[in-house]
């Protein structure tokens, strides 16, 4: 068992890890999460926007830093920006035009800072995403007007599994300087090439004056592997993909729906 005194910071993926199968926070885990957050920072590391993470913190009653858009936008516990890595506007406009032309059957959401725009809020895929992340999009095609020269943090591609696999391959080939990763079989995230969860972990460790050896991290998907590899004590959820379990140092005995992160943290830090 890991020594509780050696753990100084916690990193956790969100969907498939920190929330239930409906992608919503589990109230029963709140008391444990609050007790842990009183001792060490709990950092949510997710492909979600800040607005997709705030409701989780609010529902469980804790505060902490956020690594949004898979590490492209990192905020401290007071909401101050620690890192912003964007796709320049000119590139973003080219990417959006390419997606509309070559992949018209894919639904695209565009995210930057605290803004999420879509072509149509009545698109069933957008409606589903709004429900899952408890955030609201804005109908707009005006990337330049919405984001300006600050650029965008990510494009979210939504579609059927075979189409998303094809989209990831096509975007990676057409824009090799970008990062295109599937966060599920129906979602692909497209971000600047230097974006990674592990980079956010390193930055937040430095910000809090701790080392990766003093960190614990939880994840379930392939896009969590680099984060799990960046810390000493890494945990794959019971529901994690096989490759993730191989990459992690430990396995949580419980799934996300069984409050696995909270129960593991209770053993590690409150036991």
Enumerate the predicted regions with their spans.
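Non-catalytic pre-domain segments flanking phosphatase-related domains
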Residues: 1-12, 31, 35
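Mg2+-dependent phosphoryl-transfer enzymes with acidic/Ser/Thr/Gly-rich catalytic loops
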Residues: 2-7, 25-26, 189-271
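Active-site phosphate-binding/coordination module
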Residues: 21-125
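Hydrophobic packing residues within well-ordered alpha-helices of enzyme cores
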Residues: 29, 53-57, 167, 171, ...
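Short active-site oxyanion
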Residues: 39-43, 62-64, 153-154, 213-214, ...
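Short, structured coil segments at secondary-structure junctions
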Residues: 60-62, 70, 174-176, 230-231, ...
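Conserved acidic, metal-coordinating active-site core of Asp-based
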Residues: 105-218, 222-230
């Amino acid at each position: 068992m890991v020594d509780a005194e050696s753990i100084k910071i916690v990193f956790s993926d969100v969907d498939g890890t920190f929330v239930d199968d409906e992608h919503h926070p589990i109230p029963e885990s709140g008391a444990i999460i609050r007790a842990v957050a009183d001792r060490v920072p709990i950092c949510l590391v997710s492909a979600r926007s800040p607005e997709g993470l705030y409701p989780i913190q609010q529902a469980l009653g804790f505060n902490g830093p956020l690594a949004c858009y898979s590490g492209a936008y990192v905020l401290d516990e007071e909401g101050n920006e620690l890192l912003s890595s964007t796709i320049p506007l000119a590139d973003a406009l080219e990417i959006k035009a390419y997606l509309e032309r070559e992949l018209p059957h894919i639904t695209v959401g565009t995210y930057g800072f605290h803004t999420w725009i879509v072509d149509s809020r009545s698109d069933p895929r957008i409606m589903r995403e709004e429900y899952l992340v408890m955030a609201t999009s804005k109908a707009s095609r005006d990337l330049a007007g919405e984001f300006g020269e600050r650029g965008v943090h990510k494009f979210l591609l939504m579609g059927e599994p075979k189409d998303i696999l094809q989209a990831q391959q096509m975007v990676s080939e057409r824009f090799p300087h970008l990062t295109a990763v599937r966060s599920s079989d129906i979602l692909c995230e497209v971000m600047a090439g230097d974006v990674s969860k592990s980079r956010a972990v390193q930055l937040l460790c430095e910000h809090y004056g701790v080392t990766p050896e003093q960190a614990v991290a939880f994840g379930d998907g392939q896009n969590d592997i680099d984060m799990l590899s960046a810390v000493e004590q890494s945990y794959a959820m019971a529901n994690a993909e096989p490759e993730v379990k191989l990459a992690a140092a430990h396995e949580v005995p419980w799934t996300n729906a069984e409050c696995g992160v909270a129960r593991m943290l209770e053993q590690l830090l409150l036991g």
